[in-house]
Amino acid sequence: MSSIEGPVRVRFAPSPTGSLHIGGVRTALFNWLCARHYGGQFILRIEDTDEKRFVPGAADDISASLRWVGIDWDEGPDVGGPYGPYVQSERFEQGIYQPFINQLLEAGLAYMSFTTEEELAQMRAAAEAAGIKAFRFRGPERDWPLERQREEAASGKPYTIRLKTPLEGETRFRDLIRGGDEIVVQNNQLQDIVLIKSTGMPVYHFAHLVDDHLMKITHVMRGEEWVPSTPYHVLLYDFFGWPRPVFAHLPAILRQDGRGKLSKRKDDVATQRFRERGYLPETIFNYLALQGWSYDGVTEIMTRDELIARFTLERIQPSPARWNPEKLRDMNGIYIRKLTTEQLAERVLPFMQRAGLIGDPASETERAYLISLIPLIHERLEELQEAPDLLAFFYQDVVPGETYNPADLIPKKHDAAQTVALLRAAHEALSQQTDWTPPALETTLRALCEQLQVKPGPLFGAIRVAITGRSVAPPLFDTLAGVGRERSLSRLAAAIAALENLA
C-alpha cells in the first residue's frame, strides 16, 4: 500500500468548532476502515488551536457522534496512548511545538514577520488595484538575519512566524487517490504562510504536521480541499528531513443537485440531526462508506465486517460523490426491516417517550404494548421519528371534529345517512364479537359486507377513519385488535353520533 515500513497509522483530527458534519464522519470512517482493514491503528486527535472558532462542548459532540456511528479509536483524548496528549492546546501548553519552530528559525527556513494585519490588508488592496489576481505575501524580514529578528521581537513588537518558501524550483508530491500521479507546483506560486500566530499558538499547517510526525502517522486521509495546502506541508516535511506520509485526499460530497459541496452552514447535515430523525447508525455507517468508495459498483448493503474486509484505498474514487437523501432514507428502511420486533421497539421507544406517548421510564406493560404494535408499522417505517405519528391513535383519543373531520367518514358515492347505516351495522356486529383477534374480526366484517351487499372498501374505509382518524393506517383488522374492543366500539359510536349531525 505504501513504501512506509511498519503498521498503518491513520488519524481523524477535527476542530471543535461546532457539531460534527456528516462529511467529517465520512473522513473519519474512511480512516477507520483503512486502519481496521490493514491491521493498523486509528487515532483521534482534537485540533483546537483556532481560539476564535472554538465552541465549548464541541469536542464531546464529536466523540459522541463518532461512537454513535460505530467508530472507535485506539488512541485519543479519553483513551490515552503512547503519543499523548491528543488535544493540541494541551500539547501547546507542554511546549511540544517550540523546539521545532526554533529549529526552522535557526536553519533560516522560517522567519519572524512584523507586518501588521492593517499593512497586510493594504498590500492586498494595492495588489488588487494593480490587477494582480493572486496576492502572494513574502515579508521583507525573510532576508533579515535571525539576530535582527530577535532584537525586533525583544522591543515588544508583535509578530507571527512564517514559512520561508523557496523562490525558485518546484515542489512535487503524489496523491494515492489521484492514481499516484505526481502533482507539481512551482514554488514561485507559493507564499510565506503563517506557522505561529502572534499569540504564540501554532496554526493548523504547522501543528498537525508536527503531531503527525511525532504520532508516526503513515497515511494522511483528508478532504480534497487540502490539496492546495499540501505543497506547504511537503516543504515542511522536507525541511525537517522527515519521511512524508502517504497523501490520500478524499473526494468532495456534492449536494443532490450537484450545485456545490454539502455544507454544514447551508445544509441540514449535522450528524446529531440524523440521530434525532431516527436514522440507524448502521445505515449511516453503510451509506457513508459508499460516498466516494465502491466495492464492485453494484453491492450497496454491507455489514460492518464486510466493509472492513472489502475496503481498500485503491477503490476510493477521485470524482465527487453526490448526496442522495432519498437513497439514504430507503437504506434506512432496509436496515429497519432487518431488526427484530423487539429490537425495533427498543429503538423506537425514546421517540415515543419524547412524544409523550409512553412514560419515562416505560413500564413493562407499556413495553409489551409497544412490541405488540411494532409489526403494524415495521414495513412502513423509514425514519424512527415517524413512529409516534403512525402509532399516536393507539395511545390518544380519536375525537370527531378534533382528531378528524366527520365528513372524512363518508366514502365516495355515499352520503352521511348511508354511512351512518354502515357504521351502525358494524357497531352492532362488533359489539357481539368476543374473539377480538385479527382473523376473527376479518371474518365478521367480511360476512357483514355480504349481508349488507356492499363492497368492503366503503365499509372498511369508514371504520378505519372512525378508529384512527385517518384514511391511511395499518391493516384494519390488526388496528382494531391493537386499539382493543372497548375503545373501538366507543370510537365507532362517536363517529355515528357525529355523522348523524351531518345527515
Swiss-Prot record:
Positions binding ATP in this chain are 264
What does the record give under GO molecular function? ATP binding; glutamate-tRNA ligase activity; tRNA binding; zinc ion binding
Q: Could you say which EC number(s) this protein's record lists?
A: 6.1.1.17
CDD domains, per the entry: GluRS_core (cd00808)
Q: Which residues form the signal peptide?
A: none
Extent of motif 'KMSKS' region: 261-265
- Oxidoreductase: present as a keyword of the record? no
- Subcellular localization, as worded in the UniProt entry: Cytoplasm
Does this entry carry the keyword Nucleotide-binding?
yes
Q: Name one GO biological process term.
A: glutamyl-tRNA aminoacylation
Instruction: Output the Gene3D superfamilies linked to this UniProt entry.
Output: 1.10.10.350, Glutamate-tRNA synthetase, class I, anticodon-binding domain 1, HUPs
Query: Which reaction does this enzyme catalyse, per its entry?
Result: tRNA(Glu) + L-glutamate + ATP = L-glutamyl-tRNA(Glu) + AMP + diphosphate
What's the chief localization of this chain?
Answer: cytoplasm
Q: Which domain of life is it from?
A: Bacteria
Which terms are listed as keywords in the entry?
Aminoacyl-tRNA synthetase, ATP-binding, Cytoplasm, Ligase, Nucleotide-binding, Protein biosynthesis
Which top EC class is named for this enzyme in its record? Answer: ligase
| Cellular component GO terms held in the UniProt record | cytosol
Residue spans crossing the bilayer? none
Annotated motif 'HIGH' region: location in the chain?
14-24
Q: Which InterPro entries match?
A: aa-tRNA-synth_I_cd-bd, aa-tRNA-synth_I_codon-bd_sub2, aa-tRNA-synth_I_CS, aa_tRNA-synth_I_cd-bd_sf, Glu-tRNA-ligase_bac/mito, Glu-tRNA-synth_I_codon-bd_sub1, Glu/Gln-tRNA-synth, Glu/Gln-tRNA-synth_Ib_cat-dom
Family the UniProt entry places it in:
Belongs to the class-I aminoacyl-tRNA synthetase family. Glutamate--tRNA ligase type 1 subfamily.
Subunit (UniProt): Monomer.
Q: What does this protein do?
A: Catalyzes the attachment of glutamate to tRNA(Glu) in a two-step reaction: glutamate is first activated by ATP to form Glu-AMP and then transferred to the acceptor end of tRNA(Glu).
- Protein name (database record): Glutamate--tRNA ligase
Organism per entry: Chloroflexus aurantiacus (strain ATCC 29366 / DSM 635 / J-10-fl)
Q: What is the primary gene name for this protein?
A: gltX
